[in-house]
UniProtKB/Swiss-Prot annotation:
Protein name: Cytochrome c oxidase subunit 1
Topology in the lipid bilayer: Multi-pass membrane protein
Mitochondrial intermembrane side: 56-67, 127-139
Cofactor binding note from Swiss-Prot or TrEMBL: Binds 2 heme A groups non-covalently per subunit.
Needed co-factor(s): heme; Cu cation
Length: 188
């Protein structure tokens, strides 16, 4: 199991990084800003998330009989990932603050991503606690956590990027009303 999760866990943190970049571009653009709030903090946060993903793999293995010190380490290390993640969410919201916001579809996808990612992150903090994780192991709570963060989160970021850059790549624009309806149906 250690071999599997040592590879498999960092992968999910790396998979979400392009979504972070797309959301940063979209939020800054539709807030009328040149760059996101706290640009260097965002860069360091992405690097920290990428690196911390390599030292928390065993939080997938709390139920296999690890000793208490090992569980305490992996609980703490997993919770530390919430700090750079919180920096990113705060910076996206701070970028929107005081901006001339254009409420177009890509921004809706980005805001949907921020909401879903935040809910998924809160469920992740609960699951990082090894005592609670043992109770919640193999339940829909865990399924909800990774679907909020990666399945829906990554899809919303990708859709935001697609809707934002599709006119640039193709020369065609998407119908604004139908694309907003598409977002609404996906969000519900």
């Amino acid at each position: 199991q250690h071999l599997f999760w040592f590879f498999g866990h960092p992968e999910v943190y790396i998979l979400i990084l392009p979504g972070f970049g797309m959301v940063s571009h979209i939020v800054a653009y539709y807030a009328g800003k040149k760059e996101p709030f706290g640009y260097m903090g965002m860069v360091w946060a992405m690097m920290a998330i990428g690196l911390l993903g390599f030292i928390v793999w065993a939080h997938h293995m709390f139920t296999v009989g690890m000793d208490v010190d090992t569980r305490a380490y992996f609980t703490s290390a997993t919770m530390v990932i919430a700090i750079p993640t919180g920096v990113k969410v705060f910076s996206w919201l701070a970028t929107l603050h005081g901006g001339a916001i254009k409420w177009e579809t890509p921004l809706l996808w980005a805001l949907g991503f921020i909401f879903l990612f935040t809910v998924g992150g809160l469920t992740g903090i609960v699951l990082a606690n090894s005592s609670l994780d043992i109770v919640l192991h193999d339940t829909y709570y865990v399924v909800a956590h990774f679907h909020y963060v990666l399945s829906m989160g990554a899809v919303f970021a990708i859709m935001g990027g697609f809707v934002h850059w599709f006119p640039l790549f193709s020369g065609y624009t998407l119908h604004p009303t139908w694309s907003k309806i598409h977002f609404g149906v996906m969000f519900v």
